């Protein structure tokens, strides 16, 4: 059984999620101590506990320590179980982070997941980022899949719902040296259970920032009265690769400034010339379990560095990193 130190590096929930994903793929059990040791509320919170229970369900795993607040966990995967499953975080915990844990195991298996929780919440990728940036980048390495939004869930109420299914393909090596020439910018500006004009005003804020680019900017408005109150905007820039940026509505922040924030973040990412943004630079790492990866990223975050160390625990892999902002990463199976 592999020993994982949950306090090393960024010391957050990603260490656990990556360990769960890789354990389920490789069949290697692990014991993790110091779960989320560097967070204000260490130990398993509802979102992390849901990730554990999803992977336990999908692998018929033997698990101990899976309770709220637990700082130690043992996980020994068994046989993969296919089928359709529904899980509910019970809070506004991120459905995207739970999906990220399960998707690697779902590839080329008849597994679909309906996840209830937060679709657009702070400190995690909005579900539209998963749809507009994450999945299109997976397609570049030969993997397709679907994430459908059934209902939006914002902090603190939650109550959102997504369906994750159809992940399949023949994974191939991924090489992304640069972003290349910008062709277009797409996105979604959403508002739920609040005045509809907010979605349009968020787009206006984006257009103010991105007007310097002489490319089509197509941001859809999504207005719904079903789901917990909130707003947000996600952008995706398309060239040889795909970069993303996002912003969530907040009390006291105008809709225009929500849009400007997302536009400014995207502009900052694009100016690095890297192939992927700072979030995808981290999220892609786990997929070195399927193929060799070589790409440039806008910023080498502590999240990314920590994730690489978890990968090294489970896989025999050569790692080469050059630079920090931007950086170049090579992950090659031995």
From Swiss-Prot:
* The reaction(s) this protein catalyses: a 3'-end 3'-phospho-ribonucleotide-RNA + ATP = a 3'-end 2',3'-cyclophospho-ribonucleotide-RNA + AMP + diphosphate
UniProt xrefs under Pfam families: RTC, RTC_insert
EC number(s) of the enzyme?
Answer: 6.5.1.4
Q: Does the keyword Signal apply?
A: no
Kindly give the InterPro entries that the UniProt entry links to this protein. Answer: RNA3'-term_phos_cycl_insert, RNA3'_phos_cyclase_dom, RNA3'_phos_cyclase_dom_sf, RNA3'_term_phos_cyc, RNA3'_term_phos_cyc_type_1, RNA3'_term_phos_cycl-like_CS, RNA3'P_cycl/enolpyr_Trfase_a/b, RPTC_insert
Annotated GO MF terms: ATP binding; RNA-3'-phosphate cyclase activity
Predominant location? cytoplasm
Question: Where does it reside?
Answer: Cytoplasm
Tell me a GO biological process for this protein.
RNA processing
Residues that, per the record, bind ATP: 279-282
| Gene3D superfamilies according to UniProt | RNA 3'-terminal phosphate cyclase domain (3.65.10.20), RNA 3'-terminal phosphate cyclase, insert domain (3.30.360.20)
Q: Which residues form the active site?
A: 303 (tele-amp-histidine intermediate)
Cite a GO CC annotation.
Answer: cytoplasm
Class of the enzyme per the UniProt entry, highest EC level: ligase
What keywords are annotated for this sequence in UniProt? ATP-binding, Cytoplasm, Ligase, Nucleotide-binding
- What family does the entry list? Belongs to the RNA 3'-terminal cyclase family. Type 1 subfamily.
**Reported function:** Catalyzes the conversion of 3'-phosphate to a 2',3'-cyclic phosphodiester at the end of RNA. The mechanism of action of the enzyme occurs in 3 steps: (A) adenylation of the enzyme by ATP; (B) transfer of adenylate to an RNA-N3'P to produce RNA-N3'PP5'A; (C) and attack of the adjacent 2'-hydroxyl on the 3'-phosphorus in the diester linkage to produce the cyclic end product. The biological role of this enzyme is unknown but it is likely to function in some aspects of cellular RNA processing.
PANTHER family assigned = RNA 3' TERMINAL PHOSPHATE CYCLASE, RNA 3'-TERMINAL PHOSPHATE CYCLASE
HAMAP family per UniProt:
RTC
Write down what this protein is called.
RNA 3'-terminal phosphate cyclase
Q: What is the lineage of its organism?
A: Archaea, Thermoproteota, Thermoprotei, Sulfolobales, Sulfolobaceae
């Amino acid at each position: 059984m592999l020993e994982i130190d949950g306090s090393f590096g960024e010391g957050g929930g990603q260490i656990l999620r990556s360990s769960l994903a890789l354990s389920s793929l490789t069949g290697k059990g692990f014991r993790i101590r110091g779960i989320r040791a560097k967070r204000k509320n260490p130990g398993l919170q509802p979102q992390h506990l849901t990730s554990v229970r999803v992977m336990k369900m999908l692998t018929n795993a033997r698990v101990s320590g899976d309770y709220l607040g637990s700082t130690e966990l043992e996980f020994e995967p068994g046989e993969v179980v296919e089928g359709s499953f529904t899980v509910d975080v019970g809070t506004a915990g991120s459905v995207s982070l739970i999906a990220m844990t399960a998707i690697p195991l779902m590839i080329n298996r008849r597994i679909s997941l309906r996840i209830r929780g937060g679709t657009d919440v702070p400190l995690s990728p909005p579900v539209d980022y998963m749809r507009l940036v994450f999945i299109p980048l997976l397609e570049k390495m030969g993997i397709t899949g679907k994430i459908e939004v059934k209902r939006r869930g914002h902090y603190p109420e939650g109550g959102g719902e997504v369906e994750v299914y159809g992940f399949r393909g023949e994974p191939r090596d991924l090489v992304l040296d640069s972003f290349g020439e910008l062709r277009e910018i797409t996105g979604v500006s959403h508002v739920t259970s609040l005045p509809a004009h907010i979605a349009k005003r968020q787009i206006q804020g984006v257009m103010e920032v991105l007007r310097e680019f002489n490319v089509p900017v197509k941001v859809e408005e999504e207005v719904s009265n079903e789901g917990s109150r909130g707003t947000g905007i996600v952008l995706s820039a398309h060239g040889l690769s795909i970069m993303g940026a996002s912003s969530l509505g907040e009390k006291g922040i105008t809709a225009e400034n929500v849009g400007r924030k997302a536009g400014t973040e995207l502009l900052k990412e694009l100016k690095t010339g890297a192939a992927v943004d700072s979030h995808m630079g981290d999220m892609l790492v786990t997929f070195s379990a399927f193929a060799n990866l070589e790409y440039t990223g806008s910023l080498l975050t502590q999240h990314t560095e920590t994730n690489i160390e978890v990968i090294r625990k489970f896989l025999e892999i050569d790692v080469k990193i050059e630079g920090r902002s931007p950086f170049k990463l090579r992950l090659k199976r031995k």
